[in-house]
């Protein structure tokens, strides 16, 4: 039987430059055969922005399959695999994407209209040096309120992405609480998309 294949986009830092590749690969291929996972990688995003972050150690053990990824809070999802270098802040990267995801909604139900902006705001605060007391608790509370309650699964995917960042970058949360950040480079690494305010002429 011929193994099923899929298209995968991989993103990695190579000599200080972001390298993006698109490859066709069998489902079930080990992740470390698809993107180089050496010690300058601090975390791996599997499945895109509705997927989840993995620790480097976990990613080295896993394959491109939902059977492997889902128990760890990630998915094959959009077929995106990003190796985040240690030079960048995983919290800041995730917060930037969360702000965009909060705007990528139809605004038709409370979890998208109110919940995702509140989550993005709280995560942005946690990603700053010395966040105000209670911001992390507020973030977790909002995430719990939103999960499973949207008219679609956009809130669920967004919360999965953010919750995985809180697990994988827990040490960075502690650094930020003490007024420090381990990042040495501050330009954005994750691919971004523009987010504009919803207006009366929006497609809705």
Sequence positions of predicted segments:
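Redox cofactor-anchoring modules in respiratory/redox and cofactor-processing assemblies
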Residues: 1-204
